[in-house]
Curated annotation (Swiss-Prot):
Function description: This is one of the proteins that bind and probably mediate the attachment of the 5S RNA into the large ribosomal subunit, where it forms part of the central protuberance.
Gene from which this protein is expressed: rplR
Species in which this protein is naturally found: Dichelobacter nodosus (strain VCS1703A)
GO cellular component: cytosolic large ribosomal subunit
Keywords: Ribonucleoprotein, Ribosomal protein, RNA-binding, rRNA-binding
Keyword Ribonucleoprotein: yes
Protein name, as recorded: Large ribosomal subunit protein uL18
CDD domains membership: Ribosomal_L18_L5e
Self-association and partners: Part of the 50S ribosomal subunit; part of the 5S rRNA/L5/L18/L25 subcomplex. Contacts the 5S and 23S rRNAs.
Protein family (similarity comment): Belongs to the universal ribosomal protein uL18 family.
A molecular function GO annotation: structural constituent of ribosome
Length: 118
């Protein structure tokens, strides 16, 4: 593994530890060059409450390409809708060691605009 990926994984582990200690549900973001994934994990960290990605048919049909900011915005809106339907208004944002820039920022901004607080 290259050093850049190792450093990202280390950052993600540190963040995840702090989030788990808070006991709040968390919105975890993961990305690849072609797709972006978002999951809401319970406060104990042992159960996935909701998940959505650009692999979902609704998202893939709504966007032209799944590896851009437009698709990340759509994923952010849809994960916020799922969270609200579960009664979750406030959660912790886990960017999984990725920089808060580009697609990660677009997903977070769309989720905030749809009513989530983190």
């Amino acid at each position: 593994m290259n050093q850049k990926k190792i450093n990202r994984i280390r950052r993600g582990k540190r963040t995840r530890l702090n989030i788990r200690e808070s006991g709040k549900p968390s919105l975890i973001v993961n990305k690849t060059p072609r797709h972006i994934y978002a999951q809401i994990i319970s406060g104990e960290g042992n159960k996935v409450l909701a998940s959505i990605s650009t692999l979902n048919k609704e998202v893939a049909d709504a966007v032209h390409y799944t590896g851009n900011i437009e698709s990340a915005t759509k994923v952010g809106q849809m994960i916020a809708e799922k969270a609200k339907s579960l009664g979750i208004e406030s959660l912790a944002f886990d960017r999984n060691g990725f920089r808060y820039h580009g697609r990660v920022k677009a997903l977070a901004d769309a989720a905030r605009a749809a009513g989530l607080q983190f």
